[in-house]
Every structure is written in structure tokens, then in C-alpha cells.
Amino acid sequence: PEDIERVASVLLNEPFAEAAAKTAEIQAARGLALADVVRQLCEYVFRLHLPPKARARLVSEMADVEHRLAYVTHEKMQLYALVGAFAAAKEDVVKAAVN
């Protein structure tokens, strides 16, 4: 759980390149597979205070990443997709706050 909170914090607060690099570092240091990270992040996302549309989109994109990982797609590419999903969620949160 502590590692997942760190990953979530990185994904929500760091720019794209740094988020990808730091997430990969955490995975390597802790021996975490990306599929396991995605599954645990999904549970974590439901505890966050996100606008419903942002949460729905993020969870949907995370499910897509998990699905692609199940079919042995390139893990680094899926890491970038995960980082992109969180980047889009950050934009959705900003849009919701402005409206």
C-alpha cells in the first residue's frame, strides 16, 4: 500500500517524463510488476476525491492498460499509457474545477 501511494503521488504530481521514470524506479526497487501496480492503483483511485467523469475515464483507461498487459504487450509502452491516463485525469480535474 505504501508503494502504491508513492506511485499515485508521482503520477498525480509529476510531469509526464518524471512520472514515468519515477514509477519505473519504484517498480524496480520493490520488484513490482506493472499489472500489480495497476490493480492496486485502481483500488486507490476509488479513495481519491476526483470528479466522477475524471474517475470514470481514469479507471477505464487503467482497465485498458491491465487488459493489454494480460496479452503480453510491451510493459514500458503500457507504463507510458498509464502515465498518460493520469495526465488526462489531472486535466479533467482542472476542467471540472474551472466549470
Where are these regions (language model features)?
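Helix-rich C-terminal "collar"/helical-bundle subdomain used as an assembly and partner-interaction module
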Residues: V7-N99
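Long, charge-dense, solvent-exposed interaction surfaces that engage phosphate-rich ligands
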Residues: P1-I4
